[in-house]
Amino acid sequence: MQTFDLEAQGLRALNTALHAQPGSTNQTIWEILNPKRAHALAVGLDAPIEVNIKGSTGYYCAGMNKQATVHVHGSVGPGTAENMMSGTVIVEGDASQYAGATGNGGTLIIKGNASSRCGISMKGIDIVVKGSVGHNSAFMAQAGHLVVRGDAEDGLGDSLYEAVIYVAGRTGKLRADCQAQELTCLLYTPDPATSPTLFA
């Protein structure tokens, strides 16, 4: 395991080291200490590595992610997993505004709540929020799935295209092109044994 102290070594050195990892790297597990809400942590990754961030982050954590798994053991600032292409981003705490914005693929799991505009303009990403989401979530969502185990505030799905939204709790006022329907058939039931991150 590669251990990196962000306070001592700096953000530029961290992202440079992560970007240098080839697809065949043996340095597959990274632990980042003392993030102290730094911005742009682990952005633009493109290798099958696992990055564990031990604390909360600022803006744009794990943006433009490809292949990598980024696990934040804390909360995240605005724009987490923005324009994500593939891989997995897991947030143990809460997420600020526009988490998963414009995401094209991959999976974003938020175990707390997500603020406003979660999944705005999503284009294929799958987002699971264990808590609730703020106003205007999935605005102009074009493809992908938003699963909310809590409540959704006003403006959910405004100008929705072909994305699918599931809400276990209550919803506020729905906007244009978003229609409420009863769930009549669940095609896929995740197994807690094989998908533990969804149930932890």
Question: How should each PLM-predicted stretch be described?
Answer:
Residues 1-61, 136-138, 149, 155-157, ...:
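Long, low-complexity, mixed-charge
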